[in-house]
């Protein structure tokens, strides 16, 4: 932040005190002193062919906080980007590779928050012009990456299998050295077209998309280990996880196919190491027992997922020792927010500690993010990138190597639909679906439609889900109220709790596309909803159970719910039968401010017991709810999905439209 000093005459002790106070105010930042933002776009961008490439000049945009650290000069897919520190002059020669496609150079400023919009050159160049200044000492590696697909293989709001295939095929024509990667959660929490066939349609889709490697996400463990072994056996790509340990990795195999801590891909003259790391939160986020296995000696063990970057850094060293000249890391951890001049989240914390990677992709938080971080003395910055979930975008990155050294990295978010808020976003121009991919999806869709396109009700509007932060993981939300109220009413308990992460889509579901086009899916409402929508919103097959909870344990449970990586975690409690308020600015473990009954009577942290309905997953310790809901006293009642569907059908039978509930203040965020 820039300050302006006003010259004035100081006299006496009072003036001295005033001067000292002014000096202190300049040295100590206040909470409201700075306005932070992404960088402004460079202007007046011009370019011409030089002796060793394309010379690009620009005028920096107006200063912002956090300060601009540098500029990336690129020309998009297949070009060789170069990085220029902010302290240098605003001119650089962009390398040109042999066979580079034509394009328009552009310049983007970068700071801790991300990239500016591109400043486009007034000049463009054809491939025949670029060949005159191309050099074999310049090489480009292209990376295509997505994450958190969650079985969204149908084309609609998502790219789906067929459009991913056609887009990736077009991108590969721009660079011979192209590698395709996923940062995890390919399966699990998916629409019925994937879940009803044991997720095989998604794995078959990834094979057709020519994915080269993927890290495990927490949702790869939504079913037992035998299922994951089946997934590995069906995969034509390599699974990687450097933070599982050798013993745990030994259980993740099927025949000759096995997960590894890293893999090396030899493509277009590059040897690229791919290293993976899953979130250690997986241990809390999957159903108890899903990580258990029996080793070769017959001993019962549990897959260990280590926190930190020790395993990642070890795998990077091993990959380089094995011949990798560039290493890419896939982390199933997410960016959460830009605040106080810093990009924040477990992904960012880990990336800052990783040594020796050129690109580090994130995932898990379902957000669009990208920036550069320092790469070490004398090295180019490291590229960070993350995408939203459900196949609505992917990243297309270029890594430029000149005389054996990385000199620049660039990233574009390729979007299914335009978004003016994504500075790195470019809308896909490839709109013709791949026929083989479309046929695969149709094969499974035809088997589902008769069962799942059945209308089960009408709703007055769309039940929201997602956003930044996700509404179901950060505060009170209509679907949370609706399902928790149904639980409590059905089993006549004092309270009910639904974890926000169990709500997997809007309702009607964005990622479920009925074959029956007569159904009303858009507009002001009423909107038709189907069994397929219900399966998509609640895909996990959870059972409901009743139990007891003490006042003390209710407080403890709520602290867990607003702790962790709030507002990114699925543990956030949607509730019925009581109210609570919390202050997320306080330390984890002391955020709950007040818990009351509906009439305002305080619920004390004592041994008084209350009856509760919640999910079996939660009772048995999922999402960190360990030993708070008396698992020994739990009684399993019925399926969550049945409760949801039956309520909608009952309204339809009575000629009623199910209303989207208003938020009534049962959950309040204070502070």
Role assignments for model-derived ranges:
Residues 15-26:
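Bacterial N-terminal signal peptides
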Residues 33-40:
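Proline/serine/threonine-rich low-complexity linkers at boundaries of modular beta-sandwich domains
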Residues 52-66:
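Conserved aromatic anchor
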Residues 70-101:
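Recognizes extended acidic, P/S/T-rich segments that occur
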Residues 96-117:
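Beta-strand-rich modules
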Residues 113-133:
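Extracellular fibronectin type III
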Residues 132-421, 474, 479-486, 548, ...:
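Acidic, metal/ion-coordinating pockets
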Residues 139-142, 146, 151-152, 173, ...:
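Catalytic centers of hydrolytic enzymes
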């Amino acid at each position: 932040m820039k300050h302006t000093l006003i010259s004035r005459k100081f006299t006496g002790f009072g003036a001295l005190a005033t001067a000292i106070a002014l000096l202190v105010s300049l040295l100590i930042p206040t909470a409201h002193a700075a306005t932070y933002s992404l960088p402004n776009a460079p202007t007046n961008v011009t370019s011409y062919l030089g002796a060793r490439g394309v010379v690009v000049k620009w005028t920096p945009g107006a200063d912002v906080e956090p300060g601009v650290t540098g500029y990336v000069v690129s020309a998009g897919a297949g070009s060789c980007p170069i990085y220029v520190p902010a302290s240098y002059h605003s001119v650089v020669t962009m390398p040109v590779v042999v066979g580079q496609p034509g394009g328009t150079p552009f310049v983007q400023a970068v700071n801790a928050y991300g990239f500016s919009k591109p400043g486009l050159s007034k000049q463009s160049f054809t491939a025949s012009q670029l060949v005159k200044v191309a050099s074999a000492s310049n090489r480009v590696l292209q990376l295509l990456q997505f994450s958190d697909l969650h079985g969204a293989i149908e084309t609609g709001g998502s790219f789906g299998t067929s459009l991913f295939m056609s887009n990736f095929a077009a991108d590969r024509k721009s660079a011979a050295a192209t590698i395709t990667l996923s940062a995890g959660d390919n399966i699990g929490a998916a629409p019925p077209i994937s879940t009803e066939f044991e997720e095989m349609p998604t794995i078959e889709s990834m094979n057709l998309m020519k994915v080269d490697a993927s890290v495990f996400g927490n949702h790869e463990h939504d079913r037992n280990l035998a299922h994951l072994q089946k997934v590995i056996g069906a995969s034509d790509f390599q699974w990687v996880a450097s933070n599982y340990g050798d013993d745990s990795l030994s259980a993740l195999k099927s025949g000759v196919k096995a997960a590894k801590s890293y893999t090396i891909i030899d493509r277009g003259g590059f040897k690229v190491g791919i290293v993976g790391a899953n979130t250690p939160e997986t241990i809390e986020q999957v159903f108890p027992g899903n990580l258990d296995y029996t080793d070769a000696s017959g001993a019962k063990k549990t897959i260990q997922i280590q926190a930190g970057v020790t395993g990642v850094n070890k795998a990077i060293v091993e990959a380089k020792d094995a011949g990798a000249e560039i290493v890419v890391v896939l982390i199933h951890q997410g960016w959460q927010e830009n605040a106080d001049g810093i990009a924040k989240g477990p992904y960012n914390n880990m990336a800052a500690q990783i040594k020796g990677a050129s690109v580090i992709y994130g995932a898990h938080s379902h957000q669009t993010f990208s920036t550069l971080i320092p790469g070490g003395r004398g090295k180019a910055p490291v590229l960070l990138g993350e995408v939203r979930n459900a196949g609505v975008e992917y990243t297309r990155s270029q890594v430029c190597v000149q005389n054996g050294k990385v000199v620049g990295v660039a990233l574009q978010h390729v979007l299914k639909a335009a978004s003016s808020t994504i500075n790195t976003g470019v809308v896909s121009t490839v709109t013709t679906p791949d026929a083989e991919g479309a046929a695969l999806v149709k094969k499974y869709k035809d088997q589902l439609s008769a069962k799942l396109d059945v209308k089960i009700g009408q709703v007055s509007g769309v039940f929201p889900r997602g956003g930044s932060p996700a509404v179901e993981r950060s505060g009170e939300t209509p679907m949370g109220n609706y399902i928790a109220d149904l639980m409590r009413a059905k089993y006549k308990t004092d309270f009910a709790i639904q974890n926000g992460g169990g709500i997997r889509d809007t309702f009607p579901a964005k990622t479920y596309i009925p074959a029956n086009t007569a159904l009303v899916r858009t507009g002001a409402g009423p909107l038709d909803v189907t069994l397929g929508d219900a399966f998509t919103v609640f895909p996990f097959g959870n059972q409901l159970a009743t139990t007891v909870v003490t006042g003390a344990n209710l407080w403890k449970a709520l602290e867990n719910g607003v702790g962790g990586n709030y507002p990114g975690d699925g543990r956030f409690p949607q509730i019925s039968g009581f109210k609570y308020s919390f202050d997320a600015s306080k330390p984890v473990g002391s955020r709950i401010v007040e818990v009351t009954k509906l009439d305002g009577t305080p619920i004390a942290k004592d041994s008084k017991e209350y009856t509760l309905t919640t999910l079996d997953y939660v009772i048995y310790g999922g999402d960190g709810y360990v030993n708070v809901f008396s698992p020994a006293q739990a009684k399993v009642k019925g399926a969550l999905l049945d409760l949801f569907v039956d309520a909608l059908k009952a309204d339809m039978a009575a000629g009623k439209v199910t209303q989207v509930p208003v938020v009534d203040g049962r959950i309040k965020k204070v502070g």
